[in-house]
């Protein structure tokens, strides 16, 4: 159904742990090179099923190429790796909002596309075999409260709240685009 190419990009000028900038740079390069679909995943993902790329493309095509899809993994709450079409760039102008540094970037795209444009492929599985993060949450060495669980929980709650607010604002862009291109 499709040709697949993996792009490896290394830019040491991007601060360690600011994953969203890295994904935005890669997404822009692939978009400018006229790729139609994009899969964002970490280097600790192990694909357990075959055919997920074609199924992801078929799913998005059946939904006017608007939305988020991909294999599920060991996080049953959200998709933690994402498959989108070129329309994601046309809608937002980036892969991730620059306000998000690392944690909650996957929460954001689930929040922004849910419920109308989120299509998990439950027949495909891609396990996340990673260990502890190799970066500071939100690029903040003090985010975890130096072991104080109350501070850590409060910081997580605030980060998820700000992510939800951002997603609520960005949802309007999807509807605007969708209505314009009916």
Tell me what each language-model feature is:
Residues 19, 27, 39-40, 45-114:
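Conserved catalytic core of nucleotide-sugar-dependent glycosyltransferases
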Residues 10, 70-72, 122:
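Residue-level recognition of beta-strand->loop/alpha-helix junctions
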Residues 13-17, 73-75, 125:
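Residue-level detector of flexible, active-site-proximal loop/helix-junction positions
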Residues 15, 40, 65-68, 125, ...:
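Intrinsically disordered, low-complexity segments enriched in small/polar residues
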Residues 101-182:
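C-terminal catalytic/acceptor-binding lobe
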Residues 1-9, 61-67, 115-119:
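Structural alpha-beta junctions
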Residues 3-4, 11, 48-53, 64-65, ...:
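Intrinsic low-complexity, intrinsically disordered segments enriched in polar/basic residues
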Residues 1-35:
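Active-site-proximal specificity loops/subdomain of glycosyltransferases
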């Amino acid at each position: 159904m499709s040709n697949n190419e993996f792009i490896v990009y290394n830019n040491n000028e991007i601060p360690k742990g600011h994953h969203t900038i890295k994904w935005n740079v890669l997404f822009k390069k692939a978009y400018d090179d006229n790729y139609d679909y994009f899969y964002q995943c970490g280097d600790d993902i192990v694909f357990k099923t075959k055919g997920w790329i074609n199924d992801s493309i078929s799913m998005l095509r059946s939904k006017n190429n608007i939305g988020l899809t991909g294999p599920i993994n060991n996080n049953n709450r959200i998709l933690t790796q994402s498959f989108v079409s070129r329309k994601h760039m046309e809608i937002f102008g980036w892969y991730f909002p620059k306000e998000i540094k690392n944690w909650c970037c996957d929460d954001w795209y689930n929040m922004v596309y849910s419920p109308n444009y989120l299509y998990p492929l439950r027949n495909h599985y891609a396990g996340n075999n990673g260990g502890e993060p190799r970066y500071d949450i939100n690029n903040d060495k003090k985010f975890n409260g130096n072991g104080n669980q109350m501070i850590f929980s409060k910081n997580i709650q605030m980060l998820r709240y700000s992510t939800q607010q951002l997603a609520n604002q960005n949802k309007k862009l999807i509807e605007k685009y969708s209505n314009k291109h009916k």
